[in-house]
């Protein structure tokens, strides 16, 4: 099982089928409740 994790808040964004355990990092773009610093 693969997981995409938000690199800002460390919340899991999406799961996808994979033969091995895979973790990819991305940004959630407002899909989760992480505080976003606009600085």
Curated annotation (Swiss-Prot):
Pfam families linked: SR1P
Species for this entry: Bacillus subtilis (strain 168)
InterPro entries: SR1P
Protein name: Uncharacterized protein YkzW
């Amino acid at each position: 099982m693969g997981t995409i994790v938000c690199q800002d808040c460390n919340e899991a964004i999406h799961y996808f089928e994979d033969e091995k355990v895979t973790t990819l990092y991305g940004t959630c773009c407002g899909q989760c409740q992480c505080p976003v610093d606009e600085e």
